[in-house]
Amino acid sequence: MDRRDYIMRMIEQLGAMLTALRRRILGGEATRAEIREQMHDAAKLGGLDYDLARAMSPETLLMMIAPGGEVDPGRCWLLAELSYLDGLEAQLSDGTDATDEARSAFERAAYLFGLLKPTAANFLGVPESAERLGDIAERLNSLPP
C-alpha cells in the first residue's frame, strides 16, 4: 500500500466525518457530549489532541502544525475545521459562556484557515479556506458583544 494513498484515504475519511458532524450540529441532531466525542475521535484519527489544541495560544498552535517551520496542511486543516465546528456548536448552544466559547473557537479557526493555501482542502468535499473564512467572519460579526 502506498503511503500517500493511505494518507489521502484518511484525509477523505476525516472530511466525510466532519461534514456529517457539521450537518448534525446545524440540524440540532446531537447532544453537546456526542459532538465533543466525535470531535475528539476525529482529532485522534488525525493524530492530534484537540483538548490540548483548544488550550494553546496561536503561537503554540503554529509549533504544533509546523514543527519543522513549514505548515503541515493536513494537520492545520483538521485543527481549523475542528475549531470551526467547535464555534458552530457553541454559537448554537444555550450555555452561559457560549458567546465567548464561539468567539474563541471562530478566531482560532480563522487563524488556522488563514495559514492554508487556497486549494488545500478542495478535494475533501468541504469548502476551501477562503470560503470558510468568509463564513467565520459573518458568524463572528453576528455574535453579541
Where are these regions (language model features)?
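Mid-chain, well-packed structural core segment of small domains
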Residues: 72-97
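N-terminal alpha-helical interaction modules that lie
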Residues: 1-79, 111-115, 138-145
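Residue-level detector of solvent-exposed, low-hydrophobicity positions
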Residues: 13, 84, 91, 113, ...
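Short coil/turn connectors between adjacent alpha-helices in alpha-solenoid helical repeat scaffolds
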Residues: 23-33, 88-105
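Amphipathic alpha-helical binding modules
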Residues: 95-145
